[in-house]
């Protein structure tokens, strides 16, 4: 029998402690993305770090994974709903960074997940094709063209990727672009052949002529590529042009 004045009490179950919220790692998520540290990225995301968080440069983790060519990190970020077409403070997208770096696998991954190769970036408003051409990334150029990138797209200065390749002295890139439909006679203004002739780029001159560039194409004031070669003292280029029927503007005007 229970003692007078005492009551039997049931033992109350202990309350479960709430699970501790995961803590973000000390390594910044942008650094983890650049190094391809997938586990660190996962820890950040589990701790609530936004997948598209930006740093002082306006860059997201995906920008950094694209820049360094870390495909696994890029894949994880994209699977976590990273926006593939965001621009950083310099107006650059992850696709441009991957294309410039020659990271074909990351370029393919971005394109497969909605990256837009038509978006223009930087001061010159260049599409992704230019980023690859400027760094002589032939495999990336071929991939972009195979996915529908316009080989004759123009930047803010009305120049094409072919103009850029000629300007940077990249004969193999000139050949690749010409093979894929680049307009070898240009679209107004200075022609690619004028540029190559005036700067003494023998191999590029020969490639352009082999791809049906007009030897006697004229621009402002009736100047031909031969005029520009002569004016800049490029005797070897002048000889090549003459071999293919090249004439000066004056000769064309006089009918000689």
Where are these regions (language model features)?
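Bacterial N-terminal signal peptides
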Residues: 1-3
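Bacterial signal peptide processing site
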Residues: 7-9
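N-terminal segments that cap or nucleate solenoid repeat domains
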Residues: 18-64
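Ankyrin-repeat boundary/"N-cap" motif
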Residues: 22-31, 54-60, 87-93, 120-128, ...
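Ankyrin repeat A-helix N-terminal signature
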Residues: 31-37, 64-70, 97-103, 131-137, ...
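Ankyrin repeat structural motif
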Residues: 37-45, 70-78, 103-111, 137-145, ...
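Leucine-rich solenoid repeat scaffolds
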Residues: 218-256
């Amino acid at each position: 029998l229970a003692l007078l004045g005492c009551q039997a009490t049931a033992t109350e179950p202990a309350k479960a402690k709430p699970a501790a919220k995961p803590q973000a790692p000390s390594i910044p998520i942008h650094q983890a993305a650049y190094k391809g540290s997938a586990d660190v990225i996962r820890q950040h995301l589990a701790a609530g770090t936004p997948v598209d968080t930006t740093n002082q440069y306006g860059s997201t983790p995906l920008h950094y994974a694209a820049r360094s060519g870390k495909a696994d990190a890029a894949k994880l970020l994209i699977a976590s709903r990273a926006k593939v077409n965001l621009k950083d403070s310099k107006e650059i997208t992850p696709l441009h960074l991957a294309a410039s770096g020659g990271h074909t696998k990351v370029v393919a991954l971005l394109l497969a997940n909605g990256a837009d190769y038509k978006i223009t970036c930087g001061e010159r408003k260049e599409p992704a094709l230019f980023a690859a051409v400027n760094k002589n990334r032939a495999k990336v150029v071929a991939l972009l063209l195979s996915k529908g990138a316009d080989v004759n797209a123009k930047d803010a200065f009305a120049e094409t990727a072919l103009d850029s390749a000629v300007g940077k002295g990249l004969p193999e890139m000139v050949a690749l672009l010409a093979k894929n439909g680049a307009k070898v006679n240009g679209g107004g203004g200075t022609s690619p052949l004028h540029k190559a002739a005036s700067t003494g780029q023998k191999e590029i001159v020969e490639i352009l002529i082999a791809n049906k560039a007009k030897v006697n194409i004229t621009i402002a004031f009736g100047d031909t590529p031969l005029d520009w070669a002569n004016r800049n003292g490029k005797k070897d280029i002048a000889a090549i042009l003459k071999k293919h029927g090249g004439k000066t503007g004056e000769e064309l005007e006089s009918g000689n």
